[in-house]
Amino acid sequence: MKQYIISLICSSCLLLSSCNYLDTEPGDAISSDHFWETANAAALEQYCNLYYPKLIKGHGDPLAWNIGSMISQEYQSDNLLASGASAITFGQNTKLTSNSDWNWSTVRGCNAFLQNYQKSPASEMDKKKYAGEILFFKAFDYYNKVCLFGDVPWYDSPLDKNSPELYKGRDSRTVVMASILKTIDQAIEFLPRKTKVYRVSRDAALLLKARGDVIVTWKEM
């Protein structure tokens, strides 16, 4: 009987210790429950760093020429990508049926930052600066989507695979451009004029706003 009780106690201890191990945070993903409450300025900067190579081709290399992107995105021009000169000559060239531009991971990541960054213990100056970068990236990504697709769905919050908003229709180009310009205005307010080398500044946001204004003005003409 005594041996049975000892075995039972040992088994209980193993079960309790196993629960502690199962409750540990994943090492390869950001936990929304704890990341933002402990994210210092360096962590916010690293979060922003994810979007520089995604949206700014050749970022960090003043001599970079992204030839692959120039070729693969030729479908955006009147000279559609062809397998050879003969395909154009004999009218056999066809449009690409798919591409990676209809992707919403950047928008989702930006919305997650904007929804949670105020929880960070970083200084208000750092929080505003990095929020300005994220606002710029969200506006820039949407600007590119409008240039490619026209009407697109506008999302203001991070969604998961079960969110019903994933199945919403496209918002009109006019509505989306108004939201883009509003986002850029907030980025201009948050971003400093002088930044580290290769980081988004207020002047970059002003340039993006000018490009957005051109689209709005052209559409109204």
Where are these regions (language model features)?
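Bacterial Sec-dependent N-terminal signal peptides
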Residues: 1-28
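Acidic, glycine-rich segments characteristic of secretory precursors and extracytoplasmic regions
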Residues: 19-66, 174
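Short linear capping/connector segments at secondary-structure termini
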Residues: 28-32, 90-91, 157-165
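Conserved, well-structured interaction surfaces
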Residues: 41-45, 50-57, 79-149, 165-178, ...
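Short, solvent-exposed turn/loop segments enriched in Gly/Ser/Thr/Pro and often Arg
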Residues: 62-79, 153, 199
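TPR/Sel1-like alpha-solenoid repeat signature
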Residues: 135, 206-212
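Short coil/turn linking the two alpha-helices of tandem helical-hairpin repeats
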Residues: 146-147, 153, 195, 215-220
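Aromatic-lined, polymer-binding surfaces characteristic
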Residues: 151, 155, 198-205
